[in-house]
Amino acid sequence: MSCQQNQQQCQPPPKCPPKCTPKCPPKCPPKCPPQCPAPCSPAVSSCCGPSSGSCCGPSSGGCCSSGGGGCCLSHHRPRLFHRRRHQSPDCCESEPSGASGCCHSSGGCC
């Protein structure tokens, strides 16, 4: 009986908080690269000129290099896929008047 009582007294009190291990997992994930490469430049217009060949607009997401003024549409609608021509359905050529193809918010070209 006295031996068991001595063992209970030698045990640490339960109210003491356990110590943190020295190899604790980090709270924050590894740092990201300082700057991720942006796909589009905010200063670039949404229209492609014949000289530029290809550019990226804020709404279009990019322009096609074929034709010099082609512009990728911002929206892909399955119902318009039946209007395919020799060109890919998400590109439009420059207008005959000389204006470059522009992407409007609706996804059309001027």
Curated annotation (Swiss-Prot):
Keyword ATP-binding included in the entry's annotation: no
Coiled-coil parts of chain: none
Pfam families in alphabetical order: LCE
Disulfides per UniProt: none
Any one GO BP annotation for this protein: keratinization
Further comment found in the protein's record: Belongs to the LCE cluster present on 1q21.
Name of protein: Late cornified envelope protein 2D
Lineage: Eukaryota, Metazoa, Chordata, Craniata, Vertebrata
